[in-house]
């Protein structure tokens, strides 16, 4: 589970994001039996069910672990958000950034949530600071899009089912393109 220290991760265009997602088809996920793409697709699908009209949230779900492999697991949300923001804007970047703290928030505010965590998530929770303090909870609730960040986190935890059918990457790429403001994106 431990990875190297953060290295720069940048995307110059939609094509760069697509290329990385395609490598995730064969990149093992920390969750046994899944690839990084399996996990991202399951997360996006769960968010499509929770928030069918929020394509940005769904895309954030697909991309939330984009920095896995590029940095230490504890920093992947920051590295990923920083890499995505130039192409996808502040909302999608913030949602990616929030997904780690959202786990800490949910464990602090909903005690039953801890029981839903996989062993890998429990291990990373401890490395990421454990349950939030009351002050951290208040700070989290002051951040933009924090409620959507909770949805992303719930979907993230649910997206760990070996063999779960999902729409494939080719289904999701036009949606990713539709919210991309960089070269090759629909909002460019």
Annotate the PLM regions:
Residues 1-188:
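Metal-dependent phosphohydrolase cores
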């Amino acid at each position: 589970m431990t990875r190297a220290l953060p290295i720069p991760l940048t995307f110059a265009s939609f094509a760069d994001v697509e290329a990385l997602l395609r490598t995730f088809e064969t990149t093992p996920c920390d969750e046994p039996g899944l690839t990084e793409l399996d996990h991202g697709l399951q997360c996006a699908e769960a968010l499509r069910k929770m928030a069918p009209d929020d394509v940005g949230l769904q895309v954030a779900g697909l991309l939330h672990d984009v920095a896995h492999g590029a940095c230490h697991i504890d920093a992947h949300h920051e590295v990923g958000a920083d890499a995505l923001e130039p192409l996808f804007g502040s909302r999608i970047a913030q949602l990616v950034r929030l997904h780690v703290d959202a786990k800490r928030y949910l464990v602090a505010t909903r005690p039953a949530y801890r029981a839903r965590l996989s062993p890998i998530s429990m291990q990373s929770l401890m490395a990421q600071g454990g349950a939030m303090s009351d002050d951290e909870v208040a700070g989290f609730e002051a951040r933009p899009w924090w409620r959507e960040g909770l949805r992303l986190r719930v979907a993230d935890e649910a997206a760990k089912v070996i063999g779960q059918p999902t729409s494939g990457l080719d289904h999701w790429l036009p949606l990713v393109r539709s919210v991309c403001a960089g070269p090759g994106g629909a909002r460019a």
